[in-house]
Amino acid sequence: MENAIQTFYELECIHLKSEVRTSAEELSNILADDYVEFGSSGRVWKRKNYNNNHVLSPDVFEISHFHVDVLSSDCVLTTYHLMNHTAEKKTLRSSIWRKREEKWRLFFHQGTVTNDDQ
């Protein structure tokens, strides 16, 4: 898969943009209908939880240690470290992106709080 690192880095960055995180319409363009997230808070989120009354916080984020594993021609795993500069919290992140109808959608995401700099 050509340019996989750049493609999925950009998709993760879009997912983290405040204008996307605060728009149910924009989130619906990224999240798969069967999306599931195990949040860093320990809460489980599903796509149906994101509606006009619930959007994500518009925090300032920085991605590092970004890695892509191509699982198949239509499925990719991304892993990275995320620094939330607003909340001053570090997390380890993993996402599974699936390609459906020629569009990549976020199917699964997990955040795990860490104090480790590795």
Where are these regions (language model features)?
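A beta-strand edge to alpha-helix "cap/lid" segment located at domain peripheries
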Residues: 2-21, 25-118
